[in-house]
Regions:
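Flexible helix-coil linker/hinge segments at domain or subdomain boundaries
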Residues: 112-122, 262, 266-303
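Aromatic/basic-lined ligand-recognition segments
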Residues: 17, 122-186, 194-195, 209-215, ...
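Short, structured patches in soluble enzyme cores that scaffold and shape functional sites
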Residues: 38-40, 92-94, 180-184, 256
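Short Lys/Arg-enriched alpha/beta "domain-start" segment
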Residues: 2-85, 124-132, 136, 140, ...
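Hydrophobic, ordered structural segments
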Residues: 84-135
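Short, low-order "capping/linker" segments at domain edges
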Residues: 125-148, 293-320, 324, 331
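Conserved mixed alpha/beta catalytic, RNA-binding, or beta-rich assembly cores of soluble enzyme
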Residues: 186-238, 245-251, 255-265, 273
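Short, conserved charged micro-motifs
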Residues: 43-49, 97-102, 189-190, 262-267
Length: 333
């Protein structure tokens, strides 16, 4: 993990959101994520109209929603939003500007209402198509809050940028988040997820995607011609999946706050990998204390970075890939 000095990147183009999975176009699956905890505010009481406005600020829309006694889960045109009474998690992909939504939220509430703010941004396949860089986003955050910026992983490999607000925070012992970010789908998974003719019902039947963690209420959507998103909730817990089956850069994300027995995430990871069959993947784990390993049969650990944040969380980022067993052919462009 490396603490970053804030710099500025300049882009030559600002392009509109790309059409999903169009052959002559490109859609960026790599995501941006915001997690905010508040005090003295009931976020669910703000209502769908408020959250719809927050979502629209980053150039996305709410497609559908499900709710229970603990959480409202909104499926978005670009990923997902989960709202609890005292926190929310928002994930967006494509060329969305999640920083716009952050600003809209922070403009309404006082700094004293914010207990925790953590922003993640995965390095993109085509960063030149983005309207801002991570460093641009941080400069805008710091108009409202003080914080630190980090990079988990080497700059010339898969890596994760992270920004956290400077504020002491004591997370609950069970406040864990586990992410799996997958690349280059293979085999039958590639055929199923990249098939334009596949219906939502066929995807549900041919894969176990809705039952990676059993017992959850599920809301899912199949994009045209391809692409898939899923939200699932059970009590205060959620898991979410987003599939961008680009020929030139397929990407799938899985995330959950469900805590397995003895913090054994290997079983959940095995189920995720069975459904999507990636050539390589990252894991990102947030927990009050991380003193255990996550194992993946058949994959080689290439990168492991762990650090403790001011917010009271340990963060561990790992990158896994297939072992190199043969020479590949060059890709004809």
């Amino acid at each position: 993990m490396k603490l970053l000095k804030i710099a500025r990147f300049y882009h030559t183009k600002n392009l509109p959101i790309q059409m999903r999975c169009k052959r002559l176009d490109f859609f960026e699956g790599s995501e941006k994520k915001l997690e905010v905890y508040v005090k003295d505010v009931d976020l669910r009481a703000l209502g769908k109209e408020y959250w719809s406005g927050i979502v629209e600020r980053c150039q996305a829309k709410i497609l559908s929603s499900i709710s229970n006694d603990y959480c409202d889960a909104y499926l978005l045109s670009e990923s997902s939003l989960f709202v609890w009474k005292d926190s929310f998690t928002m994930i967006t992909c494509g060329t969305t500007m999640l920083v716009n939504s952050v600003e809209a939220f922070l403009e309404r509430f006082d700094r004293e209402n914010i207990s925790l703010l953590v922003y993640e941004r995965k390095n993109e396949y085509r960063p030149q198509l983005q309207k801002t860089s991570f460093f641009d986003d941080v400069k805008r955050f710091e108009k409202f809050v003080d914080g630190k910026a980090y990079r988990f992983g080497n700059v010339d490999e898969h890596h994760l940028f992270l920004y956290e607000m400077n504020n002491p925070y004591e997370p609950e012992p069970t406040d864990n988040t586990f992410e799996v970010l997958m690349y280059d789908l293979q085999g039958e998974a590639k055929k199923i997820w990249s098939c334009p003719k596949a219906t939502l019902e066929e995807i549900q039947t041919k894969t176990a995607v809705r039952n990676i963690i059993p017992g959850f209420q599920v809301d899912d959507f199949k994009f045209d011609p391809c692409g898939y998103s899923l939200n699932a909730i059970n009590g205060p817990h959620y898991f979410t999946i987003h599939v961008t089956p680009e020929e030139s850069g397929s990407y799938v994300s899985f995330e959950t706050n469900f805590q397995p027995e003895k913090n054994d995430y290997s079983k959940i990871l095995a189920g995720v990998l069975k459904v999507f069959q990636p050539r390589s993947f990252d894991t990102v784990l947030f927990a009050p204390r991380i003193n255990y390993k996550i194992l993946a049969d058949g994959f080689t650990l290439r990168t492991a970075v762990q650090s403790s944040l001011a917010s009271g969380f340990d963060v561990k980022y790992c990158h896994f890939s297939w072992p190199v067993e043969s020479v590949q052919s060059a890709k004809l462009l």
